[in-house]
Structures are given as structure tokens and as C-alpha cells.
Amino acid sequence: MKYNDYLEHLELREGNEECVYLDSLGKPTCGVGHLLTERERQVYQVGDEVSEEQRNAWLEQDAAMAWEAAAQQIEDLGIETAEFIIVLGSVNFQLGTRWMDKFPSAYKALKNKDYDEAIRQVSTGSGKDGQSKWKEQTPVRVEDFVTAIDKLR
């Protein structure tokens, strides 16, 4: 079942932290990469432990939103490879469901089936050593996406 594979992939890449911590951008986060809302930040402070039940509820909500966005994007992109949704869902989970606003040229290249250009667009940029800031911060996540794009050929 693809959705369960997707959830396992998210937990593998994000971890499942029991306590609230600051992510690489300094934002309070907990569970499987859940960014705390303003309301949640009033309840939970950095270092606070959060119940497994609450963390699972956040995961269900966040993962479903990213999965739905990925499904719509796959349809828009005309991609028929079923496995691609796992990684594209992960991209939506990490970068947000409007990730293509951050990487418009990559999205356009995917739509045009120009996979070399899509890979270049997500890999290079204004970050350290000419790589994208996304790749600089989370190289394994970018490599997941690059590998999935490469398999579309």
C-alpha cells in the first residue's frame, strides 16, 4: 500500500521527536516534522514532551494534506509512475504544498518532461558551493527527489 510506504518514508526522513525542538530554521517542531501552529506554541514550549497520540494526530493531518497535494501535482504533471507519489508527497510535506513556488523552473521542467533540467533546478542555486539552499540543508531529501525524477526517464 503506497500510503503506508509514504508514512514510513516520512518517519525515516523526519524522525519522530517526542519533545518540541527548534528545526534548522529555528521553528518549534515536534513529532514527524510537525511545525507547531501559533496556538500550539501557546500550549507546548521547546523541550516539552508531547503525547504519542497528539504526535500521531499531527502526522495524520500533515501527511494527508501533503499526499493530496502530491496526487493533484502528479495529475497536473502527467506522471504515471505510481512510486513517484511517495517522494513527491515527502517534498510537499517538507517544503509545503506550494513547493513549486520555490522551484518554478523545476516544476515547469517536470511538466515538460525535461528531467535533466528538473534535477538541475532542485540541485543548484545560491547555497554553499553552488547548490540549492534546500540541498544544503537536507541533501538526503534532495537526493530522494533527484533519484525519483531520474527514474521517470
Predicted regions: what they are:
Residues 7, 27-29, 85:
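A residue-level signal for beta-strand positions that form part of recognition/binding surfaces
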Residues 22-44:
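Substrate-binding/active-site groove segments that recognize
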Residues 1-17, 34, 56-60, 67, ...:
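Long, amphipathic alpha-helical surface segments
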Residues 29-31, 87-90, 117-121:
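Structural recognition of the beta-strand scaffold that forms the well-ordered cores
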Residues 9, 20, 25-27, 90, ...:
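N-terminal hydrophobic or amphipathic segments with adjacent small-residue motifs
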Residues 43-76, 82-86, 92-104:
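Alpha-helical segment that forms one wall of the substrate-binding/catalytic cleft
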Residues 29, 48-52, 109:
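Short, low-complexity, polar/charged sequence segments that are solvent-exposed and flexible
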Residues 2, 21-24, 80-83:
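Extracellular/periplasmic catalytic domains that process cell-envelope and extracellular macromolecules
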